[in-house]
């Protein structure tokens, strides 16, 4: 890590304030009465200047609930939308463009509906699907040991008791 030498002193990664021998800029000087920690005039002067390090300042938020009420404009109002976009640009924010309505998505949805309706779902086919899915089994490592040791009926009892206990206990707020 590089170090910078100023006036014979070394500066590390932490911020070092200039010492008495270095030149201070117009906004950087020590304020009078720094040894006195009372809440007198110097603090008020500091608040009035409004500029801190690197030009940042404190701006209090509105605390009056009556003034916070804002009427929402209709979405289609062009002047309001343009005004909002101007404000976003002035603040230096980037708002991504909304996704375009794609005709491909509509075609895919229509194709899916056509495919769904073309599958014959008569009672015989439903039973075939059920038998096929019943024959599907997960590999043994995918099922934890505790799940192999408890029957479905026992597991349903455990779940029901847990749900009843949760409903009976007072809700924590």
Swiss-Prot record:
Keyword Phosphoprotein appears in the UniProt entry: yes
Composition skew (Acidic residues), residue ranges: 38-48, 100-109
Region (Disordered): 1-78, 93-122
Pfam families, A to Z: MEA1
GO biological process, one term: spermatogenesis
Signal peptide: none
Alphabetically ordered keywords of this record: Developmental protein, Differentiation, Phosphoprotein, Spermatogenesis
InterPro entries membership: MEA1 (IPR009685)
Modified residues annotated as Phosphoserine in this record: 102
PANTHER family in the record: MALE-ENHANCED ANTIGEN-1
Function in brief: May play an important role in spermatogenesis and/or testis development.
Protein name from the UniProt record: Male-enhanced antigen 1
Organism: Macaca fascicularis
Gene (name only): MEA1
């Amino acid at each position: 890590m590089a170090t910078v030498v100023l006036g014979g002193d070394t500066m590390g990664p932490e911020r070092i304030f200039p010492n008495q021998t270095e030149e201070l800029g117009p906004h950087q000087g020590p304020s009078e009465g720094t040894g006195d920690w009372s809440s007198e005039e110097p603090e008020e002067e500091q608040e009035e200047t409004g500029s801190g390090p690197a030009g940042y300042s404190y701006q209090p938020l509105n605390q009056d609930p009556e003034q916070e009420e804002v009427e929402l404009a209709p979405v289609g109002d062009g002047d309001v939308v343009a005004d909002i976009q101007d404000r976003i640009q002035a603040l230096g924010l980037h708002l991504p463009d909304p996704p375009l309505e794609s005709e491909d998505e509509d075609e895919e949805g229509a194709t899916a509906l056509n495919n769904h309706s073309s599958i014959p779902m008569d009672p015989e086919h439903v039973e075939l699907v059920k038998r096929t899915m019943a024959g599907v089994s997960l590999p043994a490592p995918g099922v934890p040991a505790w799940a192999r040791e408890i029957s479905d009926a026992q597991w349903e009892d455990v779940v029901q008791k847990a749900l009843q206990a949760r409903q009976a206990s007072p809700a924590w707020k």
